[in-house]
Amino acid sequence: MDARRTNQETTGMAFNFRSFSVQKLASIAPRYLPFADVASEDVPLARLLRLSLFQVTVGMALVLLVGTLNRVMIVELAVPATLVAGMLALPLVFAPFRTFIGYKSDTHVSALGWKRVPFIWKGTLYQFGGFAIMPFALLVLSGYGEAVDAPRWIGLSSAALAFLLVGAGAHIVQTTGLALATDLVDEEDHPKVVGLMYVMLLLGMVVAALIYGALLENYTPGRLIQVIQGTAVVTVGLNLFAIWKQESRNRARAAEMENVIQPTFRQAWTSLVARPGMMRILVIIALGTFGFGMADVLLEPYGAQALGLSVAETTRLTALLAAGTLVGFGVASHLLGAGGSPMRLGRVGALIGIPGFVAIVLSPGLVGTPLFLLGIFATGIGAGLFGHATLTATIRAAPSNQTGLSLGAWGAVQASCAGVGVALAGLVRDILVGIEALNGIQAHTPYNIVFMIEIGFL
């Protein structure tokens, strides 16, 4: 009896400590975490933070693909930057479907009354499948162990499939997860809750970049495989925990939706773009995404080839960029909360990005690494201001019954332009490298020309 009582007391202490930790985090967060004031008694901050874990898994995937694997494939595995950029742009194939995914989740009919959760789970499985294929593709590309005699095209095609699955899964999870977050709060709080989700995305990217950098301090192909496999398991675990009991079962709602005549996708899309200012907002998002996004595929190789940074050091660049973006989101939260104009704030973000890229371009010939890091941080701030401003403008311009569709449209334009920008950046870099071999220009010149193109877009 005494042993049982002791066990119960121990269990109770553990439970109380866990509850205390969550409550303490929820009490501290409103003071320091942008958009944390969106929480209410019905939807406490602890619940929103738990839901936001789906953004953490998306951030992990972005860091791994755009940061670590991008540099490893170009520098260590000697894969042409055009091929790597093409692989990173493969999720572009799925990006336009974000609008359709948002529409389907708005109108989805389920026996349990769920709208968003089934799509989040499907996206999670896609991500896991991509991460499951990726290690073996990289083994073939690296010629590691028995893969030394395997045809190189097998590694390239398998890596492309893995990138596509991870990207498609991230698109599905992010679009429907953001829509689920808006379902939980009042309509006037939609921009805040989406902003909170993106803050958690950036925090996830920072933490993931630091962890990946530490794990890959002594890089080997085998260690990279372990990191990817661990990411696959963590992704499934975090997403399951994130969606657990977030969307209530409602059979009455399911029966009601079966009797409602839903508009077709074409009708819904026509209605959305007919809203005043919506097309202008989407065009601005496209230009700004080109301006900030083309550098994603080049920053890590640029740091390695122009400044001699290691794998661990270039992986941490993603953390610095995300930290700058987080600062931008925080400033945007304060200014928009005070009644600032989203479009005016978006212009300020674009203007801040210009000197950031100028600093990156000048870094090899002047101060070197410190100026390079300062430029990355500045572009992160500009991207954060621009991203939150355009996101808020998009949500405010859309009707309340088309939240998923509007978020899908914003994500589709952003992701599509980011994918095209990444592919163009790699292509331009490779073409200029060929010219470099003829004219003997410096190694960082092809990268700098791409950065100047981005300045033009901004």
Residue ranges and their predicted role:
Residues 346-390:
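C-terminal transmembrane helical hairpin of 12-TM major facilitator-type secondary transporters
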Residues 81-82, 156-157, 187-196, 311-312, ...:
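Loop-to-transmembrane helix entry/capping segments in MFS-fold secondary transporters
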Residues 172-185, 385-399:
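Intracellular juxtamembrane helix-capping segments at the cytosolic ends
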Residues 67-83, 297-314:
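Short amphipathic helix-loop junctions that connect adjacent transmembrane helices
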Residues 94-98, 127, 191-216, 411-425:
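Glycine-rich segments within core transmembrane alpha-helices of 12-TM secondary carriers
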Residues 1-46, 149-162, 172-178, 184-286, ...:
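Intracellular loop-helix junctions on the cytosolic face of multi-pass helical membrane proteins
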Residues 96-113, 216, 328-344:
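Helix-to-loop junctions at the C-terminal end of transmembrane segments
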Residues 120-152, 351-367:
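C-terminal ends and interior cores of transmembrane alpha-helices
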